[in-house]
């Protein structure tokens, strides 16, 4: 079972949710499928991305792995049922690679900032590589989460949690990312 290694202000880290060997296999998979990736590059972010929805069996397996940690996050943060979404779903899983000593990074931002992202209520990043740099930082809270194989980082996606993916200087950084979304049922719409 994964170990809780950080739980502060709803920023929660679990270590060991994926075995190191599986992390290595997933990285190999990414590199073998590099022709299915695209380069995301703007003035405030740069990385290589593979959307796992193009390979449904992998996306389903990763989603199945993440679901129990949503419940554990709720429990570990003492979130009561009356304020937690009664139903939710996961956004498509994205696989990202940040190369060292390049412009790859994701400057300070929030992950739910408009109509297209407003149904997100929980961020989930799984680190697949060990890195001495490339931390996910929360400058307002003086928290930095180091990339570590098999580590899961969870936190709210809104403007109260601005964060950044810092530049990598040692080896490529690989992460899987998804979001829990509010899933509106017809009888909930009022």
Please report, for each region that a protein language model flagged, where it lies by residue.
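Fe(II)/2-oxoglutarate oxygenase catalytic core
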Residues: 1-152, 160-190
